[in-house]
Amino acid sequence: MREEFKLKPISREAIPRAIQKAERYRLINQSWAAESICRDILEIDPTNQQVVVMFVLALTDQLVDTHAHAMKTVHETLPRITDPYHRAYYTGITFERSGQALLQRGGMGSGAMAYDAFREAMGWYERAEAIRPSGNDDAILRWNTCARLISGSSHLAPQAENAYEPALDD
């Protein structure tokens, strides 16, 4: 049996320091700790856009290990990003990182699933590009990265029309 705890709330005054800690934990590859801090901040300030974005990034940092659970939470969180450009851009980041996680995990069909994720990311980057602020070409840089990944790997290709289907006994 798992032990349950009543979590302790942080004070509103502690939010700036907590944000700095979350950023540091992401930098040292302890995204699970950054995720936890973001959850604490969002309990107090649920519309804090910097923290909503950091929460999405902390979750997507962990996709190799927790793909299904993290993706569900990410997709529930992305609509909380209020700026249309940032929402499109970070949705693209989410799909790109999902594709990278699929490639790292490998397995049957992972190349085609990763291809689909990268193509979905590219679509979101194109949406972001269309509404980007002047001088911000981040979406173009990410789109180009996905294009180079797909072009440079024979493992990344769409699912074959005549994909393998196991024979069934009559």
How does the language model describe each region?
Residues 1-9, 32-38, 68-76:
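Repeat-mediated protein-protein interaction surfaces in helical alpha-solenoids
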Residues 32-33, 39, 43-51:
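Glycine- and aromatic-enriched membrane insertion/assembly motifs of diderm outer-membrane
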Residues 2-5, 130, 134-170:
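Terminal, low-structured helical/coil segments at or just beyond the last alpha-helical repeat
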Residues 9, 42-43, 76-83, 130, ...:
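Conserved structural position within tetratricopeptide repeats
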Residues 2-17, 78-80, 112:
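TPR-adjacent "capping" and linker segments in tetratricopeptide-repeat scaffold/adaptor proteins
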Residues 12-17, 45-59, 82-106, 137-149:
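Amphipathic alpha-helical repeat scaffolds of TPR domains
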Residues 59-83, 90-127, 152-166:
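Short coil/linker segments at helix-helix boundaries
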Residues 13-37, 107-109:
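Alpha-helical segment of the N-proximal tetratricopeptide repeat
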